[in-house]
Amino acid sequence: MHRGYDGLREHDFNEAHFEALKAARTGWPMVDACVTMLRETGWLNFRMRAMLVSVAAYPLWLHWRPVGEWLATQFLDYEPGIHWSQLQMQSGTTGINTTRVYNPIKQAQDHDPHGRFVRQWLPTMRQVPDTWLFEPWLMPDTMQAHLGVFTGCNSYTPSALVQPVVDLAQATREAKQLLHSRRQTDEVKAAKKAVVDKHASRKNWGTRSATSRRSPASKKADKQQLGFDF
């Protein structure tokens, strides 16, 4: 969509990060639970789809195309016209959309506060207390030994809790800096108008309120889409 972002992530693609994402072994429980559910059911709500792409694009620093090709094989409702524009938007490479970076720990705390969803799809997490459910790597060694679960395991045994593949805060911060630096280049700035002219709505660009023009029925549907009652 925006050629100014070509080369931003492609040459730094980390295959180990990609494999960890596809295997539901990133170490972030909400991400791994979502991938597990997606593989089993072929469906996720919109917020969690956006979170997966955001995690792939920022802390894991994966290019949107391989991630999108993989997700396309997982979604039962895959629709190319929606899918690929969303991949680029959530990756911050359209040049015309606000950058949205989803913190998988905060998403879990906000949308699965009691851990029902995570525990449903990650059996290993069922015995982890709420205090450490979304950050199990912080659990004291004595507690791990008591529960019979251990972080940092590389094996796929039932007792293995995976360490995060990267430091979330540091990796996200570095990704934002790289994206911001690219946005300041003359090439990206010059191409923005062409992207707006081709892809953005012609009516009142930049002035419309998304919430003000939407019907109550649409807002109700959004609320249902963001829920975890499956």
Where in the sequence are the language-model features?
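C-terminal catalytic domain of photolyase/cryptochrome flavoproteins
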Residues: 1-230
